[in-house]
Amino acid sequence: MTNITFSETFDKVQECFEESSIKDQLESITIIRDVQGKIRLFLEPLENKNLEDIILNHLEERLENKLVSYYGHDIWLPQGEKDGYKNLIDVIRSERVSAEWDDESQPRWYVLERHVAKQAWTNKKETEPPWPQKVVDQGHKPAIVSFFSFKGGVGRTTTLVATALTLARHGHQVAVVDLDLESPGIFTFFFPDREKSLPGIIDYLLEKNIQGKNWELKDHLESFKDENLLGDEDRILPILSAGNVDNNYLEKLARLDCQNLLNVNNPLEKTWSDMFKELNEAASDKFKELNEAAGKLDFILLDTRTGFHDLGGLAIAEFSHAAVIFGTQSRQSWAGLTQVIRRLAKPLAPEALPLLLIHALAPGIGVPGREQELRKFREDAYSVFQDHYYSSSEDVPNSNGQEDRFYPIVIDWQSELRREINLFEYSAVEEDSSLLNIIDILTGKPYQRLAERLCRLFNRKLNLKN
């Protein structure tokens, strides 16, 4: 008897059925893997088929032999309406999802996973963002777009800020949201330190559940205004910060259950959805105050938490209409990005989540090895998308398709962006060439290319001024 690991359990279960005649008598097989990783089964026989005890006993023996300590010693079968297991069976049927290896032949294979945390990353069921993709494509609602990086230090937040500025300068109405609650930073780009800042997301999530309608997001939405940066004296950039990082911030953060965001008993999920709806209304009202004709929000850009954090998973997989994901040419980066791309393929949804891939920190023009790295990143991206993003029923695009989702947008490493960027210092930009240079970089070709491709995802044009 050989010990096995967690990663081998599903394969071992399949081996047990390949070696047993019981497979021909079943309509479906559901593998239930509990929080410890132990395996139990729910078997549904074909109509008018009764599974004999001797066959079930042989299956039990095989499961014990192959799964060893990972076998949970339970095989459940459908029973009559009065059976005590009925509620359990109903839960299994409602929560299970098709197994990745299921080919829709008999018997069907299903999986039901039990988790302690990371539901946002492991949830395989189809979900809906705060408003449907259809109304976004029709231009009736803003597109919610998450900026995500598996590793830190790749310029994600800076790229989000640059994209927001680029979109705004071309006539789009944009709002920025700092969802990186454990490492907030968006606020410092746009505003100086204050003795007392406006409340942010962390306050909304706590106060809304206590105060209800008495706590309105519109009273706490910051507005950044700068003609040099936004291209129009009447244009603003609404910003919802993470919150004021003061002596109470950690106490507030400690009261948010981010590990069970998809749990039906966790009120936060609905609060999140309500927040985006309030944000859309509040930002639109701010635009109308400046210009009655410009009262509609086009984009909401979310800065998310690095890595497999529950909140980052919730943002890109549950709330967003698209995601911008960042990677570097390294094994570490591709190991994580592969799983992110696999998750966002949404195998049970009609379509995968639209993605844009950023090749971050790429060598600059003239740096030795640049072309080799760019080529290798493109090749790896195509391979990962081919294996994990496109469904078996889709035709995979040609590897040279520069507008396809796997084709990376290259953002070179910029020494000028290494220092802290304070956009609120730009009030006298014409007198300071170094600050003017920063503006040129943040609204330069790579970010224009990103903004243009982002607009195309939603059937929009980048330049609305012409």
Give the location of each predicted region:
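C-terminal lobe/tail of nucleotide-utilizing enzymes
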Residues: 2-135, 346-466
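Phosphate/oxyanion-binding active-site loops and adjacent basic polyanion-contact surfaces
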Residues: 6, 156, 264-275, 332-336, ...
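Conserved catalytic-core segment of NTP-binding enzymes
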Residues: 51-57, 61-63, 170, 273-396, ...
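Walker A/P-loop phosphate-binding motif and the immediately C-terminal alpha-helix
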Residues: 131-132, 137-183, 187-189
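Extended hydrophobic secondary-structure segments that form protein cores and membrane-embedded regions
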Residues: 145-147, 238-241, 301-303, 355-361, ...
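Short, flexible loop/turn elements at secondary-structure junctions
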Residues: 149-151, 181-183, 244, 306, ...
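P-loop/Walker-type NTP enzyme "switch/lid" segment
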Residues: 181-292
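A short helix-to-beta-strand connector/capping loop
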Residues: 229-239, 296, 351-353, 402-407
